[in-house]
Amino acid sequence: MPSSISWGLLLLAALSCLGPGSLAQDAQETEASKQDQEHPASHRIAPHLAEFALSFYRVLARQSNTTNIFFSPVSIATALAMLSLGTKGDTHTQILEGLDFNLTEMAEADIHQGFQNLLQTLNRPNTQLQLTSGNGLFIDRNLKLLDKFLEDVKSLYHSEAFSTNFTNTQEARQQINSYVEKGTQGKIVELLKELDRDTVLALVNYIFFKGKWKQPFNEEQTREKDFHVDEATTVRVPMMNRLGMFHLHHCSTLASWVLQMDYLGNATAIFLLPDKGKMQHLEDTVTTEILTKFLKNRQTTKSQLYFPKVSISGTYDLKDVLSSLGITKVFSSEADLSGVTEEAPLSVSKALHKAVLDIDEEGTEAAGGTVLGNIRSTLRYEVIFDRPFLVVIYEHHTKSPLFVGKVVNPTQQ
């Protein structure tokens, strides 16, 4: 066993969102209130996950304003929280504080119970919404982990443990990639392109989401239209459209249109379309409090909506992003992962995250409920998503942001 060992930490998320539709009804709010009583543990960590999500987003947005952004804060936070079980000292503190937790305000046991409850809820069978997540621990067959760490990651994070031959990097890479590909139903293939030779432990998290809109768009109405990436760049995209009742309003604080669309089941997508030239203002101004207020106070109007079909992905080396959030020790020779194993010093050599977003017309019925012949209210808005916009996808039962992103160019893979 070498004296210096690196731990490869891999994080990923896959999302397939199929077809926009109108938003939640009173029944959904009633169900959500029942869930509030059933799942207080996950609700306690939800505000912190939301703050982490926005902080993470802003780091990525500062790095580039010309590329799409898409990631799963729940996936990244889950992997880091699980990793924190084996850390000590400053390494431990940095991870939890980087996730927006303050141990003087919330006991660490409550944090891990929150994640345990979150994972249990997300993996609950749902006939209307496909939502699954998983944690895999790939352990070198010659490495002895501490019993407590192994017990905690299995009981709190429902992690599966796999014996892995890391001396054969090609075999180990294939084993990890196969686990990810299976968990994401083939949406993410070959996440891990290469594996460091001194890796002895890999932690993998995935989340898979496939939702259908309550009221889908009619595919026959989709037409090619212009999407203005910036003042100098215009691309042609398939633009869906529907006349209907939408949870849609203009927010003067954000200088943006706010559109909320529910999935069958228990998730909602919030789309934020800034006024022309106001993307920077939106990114600087949006807060978790504002987003929460949108979810609680919905305004329904009859509108003509134009929305692009989207297929984008985001792949990130988390080391740079997390370092900007103060999580640095775990990636250095000063890392204290003595709660994982006592055999040799560990540090995280690689932290990868990939998320995939697909949005199209599809719904449970081909065109059910899409024609508004009996709705007599006056058409109030015509809103066209033909320029960059933000998206946040919330899971209602846990009150958590599953995915966050920015669509700059729908044709950019």
From Swiss-Prot:
Domain of life where this protein originates: Eukaryota
Question: InterPro entries from the entry?
Answer: Serpin_CS (IPR023795), Serpin_dom (IPR023796), Serpin_fam (IPR000215), Serpin_sf (IPR036186), Serpin_sf_1 (IPR042178), Serpin_sf_2 (IPR042185)
> In which tissues does this protein get expressed?
Expressed in liver.
Provide a Gene Ontology MF annotation, just one.
Answer: serine-type endopeptidase inhibitor activity
Q: Any idea which residues bear Pyrrolidone carboxylic acid here?
A: Q25
Residue segments, region RCL: 368-387
Q: What Gene Ontology terms describe where this protein resides (cellular component)?
A: extracellular space
* Glycosylation sites recorded in the entry for this protein: N65, N102, N165, N266
From the UniProt annotation, give the residues forming the signal peptide.
1-24
Site feature: Reactive bond: S377, T378
The UniProt keywords, alphabetically, are:
Glycoprotein, Protease inhibitor, Pyrrolidone carboxylic acid, Serine protease inhibitor, Signal
Instruction: State the similarity comment.
Output: Belongs to the serpin family.
Q: What is known of its domains?
A: The reactive center loop (RCL) extends out from the body of the protein and directs binding to the target protease. The protease cleaves the serpin at the reactive site within the RCL, establishing a covalent linkage between the serpin reactive site and the active site of the protease. The resulting inactive serpin-protease complex is highly stable.
Q: What is this protein called?
A: Alpha-1-antitrypsin-like protein CM55-ST
